[in-house]
Amino acid sequence: MDLSAALEFLRAHNINLGVNNALVAWRALERGIRVQGDAKGRVRMRAYGRTMRFKHGWTNLNPRIVGRCTVNKDVTSRLLRPRGVRAPENAFFGADDIKRAWAWAEPILPVVVKPSNSTKGRLVYVGITDVDDFGAAFASVAEVFGGALVEEFVPGVEHRVTVVGGAVVAATRRVAANVVGDGGSTVGELVAEKNRQRADGSNPIHKYIALDSFADRELTRQGLTLQSVPSAGQRVFLRATTNLHTGGDAVDATDALTPVDIQLVERAARALPGLKLGGFDVLRPPPGDAGEPCVLEVNMSPMLSMHHYPWEGQPREVASRLIDVMYPETADKDHRLE
């Protein structure tokens, strides 16, 4: 079975389409586990007297309390810090509390303004340094969500580290939507070419780069426009945030993790009661910085497919690790990172 066959299986069995669902169903079927769809379109697996469910990263392996703890980013930070895990200082403010929010933010500028729950990188404003930008960002987020999370800006290189069964199994360095100059093409032409590459279907998870107000803002910050011609090898960013849903690149970084990184993430996983599957957004210190990693947030519906289909680097077999934990009777070896 390959990915296209797995997607056809989902269609035939009333399971919600998606690469994550297809990967998990595929790996379960390979082990002889019975797979069906349930009334909610989830992957329903049955073997050894146990029923497991999966849908777009969510699984009933995780108890509900974990989801309640992590749905709001400020709550997650307050759970992690007392357990020795570095996490950013942050606070949520209602739509009418912009003055109080600015008073909280001003002493620790620059800050990040974003929704308090996951939005896949949308409406996230990074590196706010003045009251005008703060007010515009706060109003934009609060209009949609009734308030905004204000958070200290932590410098570093963002990674998504996936934990299965308490162990780190893979890591991806997510690079914000970008193009690399060839010395002759404009930024707009480079974006069009990268979007054409993403349309061919060979990598099913990477999204188009949108040319919108967020792209304009980021280009302006770099002193560029869509008509600019970057030099050969010059990387131009179209987003300040690194989310794949807004056109970012997934670059495998599993082998780059240090023992300190792995220990920190696994300690964070233990701080969340009953967690079996989670995606940890971790800021690793910039090169040459001796600081410790920082856990930005925890996602209870992690995108497993980013590890299977990186834009650059080695694919990692994460779906099989999940089946190992769901049905250890079918596991053939220990996949824990050393």
Feature-to-residue mapping (PLM):
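Active-site nucleotide/adenylate-binding loops and adjacent lid/helix of ATP-dependent enzymes
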Residues: 52-56, 61-209, 259-262
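Short acidic (Asp/Glu) and glycine-rich catalytic loops that position anionic groups and cofactors
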Residues: 3-5, 241-247, 297-302
